[in-house]
Design a protein with these regions (language model features):
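A short beta-loop-alpha structural element at the N-terminal edge
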Residues: 1-12, 17-20
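Conserved beta-strand in the GNAT
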Residues: 50-52, 58-68, 78, 83
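A conserved beta-turn-beta hairpin within the catalytic core of GNAT-like acetyltransferases
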Residues: 68-80, 89, 107
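Conserved beta-strand-loop-alpha-helix junction that forms the acyl-donor binding cleft
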Residues: 110-125, 129, 138-142
Length: 152
């Protein structure tokens, strides 16, 4: 994502986070703005990278990658946010995008999925199971599952 596309990504991220936050915390007010204190760091901090998911040249979603493991364990890369826009879902694009993202960094990866998001739970289980990764494990927590795996 180029710097001049930052506002477009922010709009997509906000829309995604509003829906996602409503899944995770049903008590919050629907449509309440989201707070992303590290958003600007994706263009200035080493290890943070924003990417578009493209379909035929059209923006079909985004991936935010950083090095901050949800488990607190050491990792080389983590999927911070991942979104395929609704019009592009159920076409295999998300799985292909996840696999391409995993190829961006060699080493230990992590991502977390909230249990309140069963579609996301199923998606990530399939995406990881079909990816060229090793040592895939899950850390089950009360409200979420953390996936860990290695890429070569």
């Amino acid at each position: 994502v180029r710097l001049d596309e930052k506002a477009a990504l922010r709009a997509d991220l906000d829309a995604y986070l509003i829906v996602h936050a409503d899944l995770v915390d049903p008590a919050r007010r629907h449509g309440e703005p989201t707070h992303q204190p590290y958003y600007d760091a994706y263009w200035s901090e080493e290890g943070r990278r924003p990417f578009w998911i493209l379909a035929g040249g059209a923006r079909a979603g985004f991936v935010l990658i950083n090095r901050h493991a949800p488990s607190g364990l050491a990792c080389d890369a983590a999927v911070a946010e991942f979104c395929v826009l609704p019009a592009f879902r159920r076409m295999g694009l998300g799985r292909a995008a996840a696999h391409r993202a995993f190829a961006l960094a060699v080493g230990q990866w992590e991502l977390q999925v909230h249990r309140a998001n069963p579609v996301g739970m199923a998606f990530w289980a399939r995406a990881i199971a079909t990816a060229p990764v090793a040592g895939a494990t899950e850390i089950p927590l009360e409200d979420r599952v953390i996936h860990r795996f290695r890429t070569a």
